[in-house]
Amino acid sequence: MITRFFRISKPFHYILFLLGLILLFFFQYGHQTGQDDFFSLLKQGLILIAFLLSLFLSVFIITKNNLTENNSFAALYFCGLIFLTPQSLSDWEIIFSNLFVMLSFRRVFSLKTKQNLKKKYFDASLWVTIATLFYVWSAFYFIPLLVSIVTVS
């Protein structure tokens, strides 16, 4: 039944995912903060925007590179993993690091066109470096980048 519902990608699915993740986010951050000043609300808003951008960026990468067919399973798996591990929303550094790693993956997947390779390598390594500034363990994402340099070049 779930497979039949998400078999074809529809805008309704993404609205459903968006609402579910926003509710989970506010439930997670609503219990953590006791401050309701402007700057804490602004910080939470930026974290939410970065989190939702990483969701839509992952869906964009998957659909643009034809990693799955025209369905909503990638967004379903992303949301399912977030719902299974809601503590991943508690650290804002990981959320921003994830966003920059996703931007790096976008450039790594675009290497198959073999145009402007140096620019794409630089761009991907720049995004991983920025992700590493937020979360140190993101430096391990240089390994797939190095593997792609060896295999594509």
Model region roles, listed by residue range:
Residues 141-153:
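Perimembrane helix-loop-helix junctions
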Residues 76-95:
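Aromatic- and kink-enriched transmembrane "portal" helix at the membrane-lumen/periplasm boundary
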Residues 62-81:
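Transmembrane-helix signature of polytopic, membrane-embedded enzymes
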Residues 26-36:
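Juxtamembrane "helix-exit" motif on the non-cytosolic side of transmembrane helices
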Residues 66, 104-119:
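Membrane-interface transmembrane helices that cradle and orient dolichyl/undecaprenyl
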Residues 1-19, 68-69:
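N-terminal membrane topogenic signal
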Residues 49-65:
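Transmembrane-helix motifs of polytopic, lipid-linked glycan transferases
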